[in-house]
Every structure is written in C-alpha cells, then in structure tokens.
C-alpha cells in the first residue's frame, strides 16, 4: 500500500479510525458501544480464526486487495472500539508491581512460537485473537493501575512520545540499510554491527527531531484552532 514507507499502511487505518471516532463513535452510548464491540469481535474471530485470508495470522491490511482491505478494517475497528470501551468503564485500583507484571506477561506472550493450523482452524490466529480480545486489554488495565515516579516516569513518557514518530520514520532508513547490505554481500551481524548501531541511532535522532520540530508544534496549533 505504501511501498516507500511500509508501516504507513497501519497509520492509514488509524487515520480512518480517528475519523470514525470524530464522526460517530464518540457519540455512541456505552451500551451501544459494547454491542458494537461484540459484533466486531465476532467478525474478528470469524475472519482470522477461520483463516479467510489464508495467512494463518492476523497480519493483514498492508495491501489494497479485497482480503487485506476488509481484514484491515476488521483488525482496526475491534481493538479500537475495545479500547474505547475499556476507557469508559475503567475503574482504577492500585496494583503493585504493575510494570513488572506487564513486562513479564509480554515476554511470555511474545515468546510463544507459531502454532500450526488444525482441521481448517487457524490455531495461531486463535491465539492472537485471545491475546487481542482478552489478555492485552487486561494488561492495559493492570498497567493503568500502576504508578511510576521520578526517572522511571520521565523515561516512560519519553519512550511513549518517541514511539509514534520512530515507527513511521525508521523504515526508509532500513531500506537504505538493506540496500547497502545487499550491495556489499553482508548477511551477518558481525559484518555490519557498527553500521547497524548507526542505523538505530539515526532513526531515534530523526524521530526525536520530527517529534519536537513537527509533531508537537502541529498538535499545539491544532489544539488552539479547536478552541
């Protein structure tokens, strides 16, 4: 969908989600939103667990063919509405060690290997669906019930602010890096680690500059215009 910057496809759907929120989703009552989320959850389970895309995973949306386009909308709208519902119904409680609970859980979840399909059922997609529908919302709740202060709070804030621009600017740099690797027949980390470190550092620096020189000023301007 976006050949010069691959991650742009997911932001494309996020923009659509934000438009839907501004036009009608924010006006939904909590009961209507809950019913809407339930329907989207059923569609999500049918599409991915039934392996409609034949990808055996939820990784769809990155092209504009029929399966990816509709799959991308389903992939967007279910977690999006789930997040809205969680925000509306959230009741904070104090959870000790929330950071370590969430960190440990994510390490375990991400360490689970690919699960082969069985009798036409995508078990890998089923696992991913359970994570999206149940486990990730629970982890968001636990994380929101935690607290941080001092350096930890500042570090978390900085990393959170940097994550969005880093996601969208790092891939063009990676393309250049890939081209350099292929041109020089380098296929191991031992042969390119200094350049790899430079790629990481330059990606972070570019993301930081985009955040401070573009993202934050534009958001401040838009906030003033909306008042």
Predicted regions and their residues:
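Aromatic-anchored segments of alpha-helical transmembrane domains
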Residues: 38-52, 104-117
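Alpha-helical transmembrane segments in multi-pass integral membrane proteins
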Residues: 24-28, 61-204, 220-226
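Membrane-interface helix-loop-helix regions
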Residues: 1-15, 31-32, 42-67, 73, ...
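Alpha-helical transmembrane segments of multi-pass membrane transporters/translocases
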Residues: 17, 199-211
């Amino acid at each position: 969908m976006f050949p010069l910057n691959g991650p742009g496809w997911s932001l494309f759907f996020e923009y659509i989600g934000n438009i839907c929120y501004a036009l009608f989703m924010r006006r939904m009552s909590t009961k209507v939103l809950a019913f809407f989320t339930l329907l989207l959850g059923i569609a999500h389970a049918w599409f991915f667990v039934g392996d409609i895309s034949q990808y055996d995973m939820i990784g769809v949306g990155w092209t504009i063919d029929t399966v990816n386009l509709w799959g991308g909308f389903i992939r967007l709208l279910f977690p999006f509405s789930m997040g809205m519902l969680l925000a509306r119904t959230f009741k904070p409680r104090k959870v000790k060690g929330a950071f370590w609970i969430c960190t440990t859980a994510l390490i375990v979840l991400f360490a689970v290997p690919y699960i082969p399909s069985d009798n036409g059922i995508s078990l890998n997609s089923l696992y991913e669906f359970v994570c999206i529908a149940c486990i990730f919302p629970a982890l968001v709740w636990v994380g929101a019930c935690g607290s941080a202060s001092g350096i930890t709070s500042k570090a978390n804030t900085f990393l959170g602010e940097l994550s969005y621009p880093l996601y969208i600017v790092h891939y063009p740099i990676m393309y250049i890096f890939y081209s350099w690797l292929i041109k020089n027949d380098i296929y191991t980390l031992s042969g390119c680690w200094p350049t790899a470190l430079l790629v990481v550092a330059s990606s972070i620096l570019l993301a930081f500059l985009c955040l401070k020189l573009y993202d934050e000023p534009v958001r401040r301007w838009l906030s003033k215009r909306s008042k």
